[in-house]
């Protein structure tokens, strides 16, 4: 599977409004719509010399380095929390498709309640999901046209995926095609309209010019979903538990970006005394939206 490069996007994906330069590093730019606030990288997803996106071309070794992170109980807890959220709106035994399944933690947890399968463009991640998570994950992308999927699923999930997609409208349209009548879509993504994002500005930790090519606010993502035939039924934020060692290291990595983050990192150094301890964190800057597919023509 080879994801084609898309044309450089000069206008907003959501409202077609003009964009203004917000951040530039090397040949990568981050542009924000002056009308609705949608923020994107015009150059789209990074491609490797072989013409593959970075999500298709990563090796299995990349995932092997993060074995402990992916199998950590907090990662599984986060996946199970999402599965429980889905279960509030979708009956047990329903057919579920997880888009961008990564190493299969959510598919594994969802399989306890649903007939769940995942698609993931990275062969290394798929191999890891099968070997370590024993999850039903296939190599594939939401942009692949799979006729057998049309109208098949009672639920489609896109957890921490849409920010990596440079054609989010097309991705949501395909999700809608794969849903059965009255099916449910579940999306989580960083909220660039959140208080935390506004406080940190360009130093916000979800500003990533390599990977996060589409950044939404709650308002403009709701607008995009409505335009693709979805009715919002639930909104919430998501956090998770993190090891002290992970928090301290992440703050160290980010501390060069702003004076505020340098101060926060300095205050976090005592976390090294108990690296294996966990703390729950929810800054309110990761949104979750549950949306029901409206009947055609409504």
Regions found by a protein language model. Give the residues of each.
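Short N-terminal helix/helix-N-cap motif within the alpha/beta-hydrolase-1
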Residues: 166-170, 197
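Short, glycine-/aromatic-enriched active-site segment of Class I SAM-dependent methyltransferases
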Residues: 187-214, 219-225, 246-252
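A transmembrane-helix-recognition feature enriched in membrane-embedded lipid enzymes
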Residues: 259-285
């Amino acid at each position: 599977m080879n994801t084609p490069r898309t044309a450089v996007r000069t206008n907003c994906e959501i409202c077609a409004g003009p964009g203004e330069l917000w951040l530039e590093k090397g040949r990568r730019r981050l542009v924000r719509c002056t009308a609705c606030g949608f923020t994107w990288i015009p150059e789209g997803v990074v491609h490797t010399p072989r013409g593959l996106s970075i999500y298709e071309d990563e090796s299995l070794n990349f995932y092997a380095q993060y074995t402990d992170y992916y199998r950590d109980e907090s990662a599984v807890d986060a996946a199970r929390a999402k599965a429980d959220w889905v279960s509030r709106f979708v009956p047990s035994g329903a057919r579920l498709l997880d888009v961008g399944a990564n190493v299969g933690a959510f598919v594994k947890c969802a399989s306890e309640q649903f007939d769940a399968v995942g698609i993931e463009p990275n062969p290394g991640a798929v191999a890891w999901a099968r070997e370590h998570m024993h999850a039903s994950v296939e190599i594939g992308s939401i942009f692949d046209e799979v006729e057998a999927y049309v109208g098949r699923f009672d639920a489609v999930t896109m957890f921490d995926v849409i920010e990596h997609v440079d054609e989010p409208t097309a991705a949501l349209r395909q999700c809608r095609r794969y849903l059965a009548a009255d099916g449910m879509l579940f999306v989580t993504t960083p909220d660039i309209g959140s208080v935390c994002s506004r406080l940190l500005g360009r130093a916000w930790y979800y500003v990533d010019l390599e990977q996060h090519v589409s950044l939404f606010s709650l308002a403009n993502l709701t607008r995009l979903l409505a335009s693709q035939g979805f009715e919002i039924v639930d909104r919430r934020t998501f956090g998770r538990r993190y090891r002290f060692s992970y928090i301290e290291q992440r703050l160290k990595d980010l501390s060069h970006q702003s004076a505020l983050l340098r101060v926060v990192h300095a205050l976090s150094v005592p976390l090294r005394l108990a690296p294996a301890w966990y703390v729950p964190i929810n800054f309110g800057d990761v949104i979750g939206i549950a949306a029901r597919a409206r009947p055609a023509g409504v």
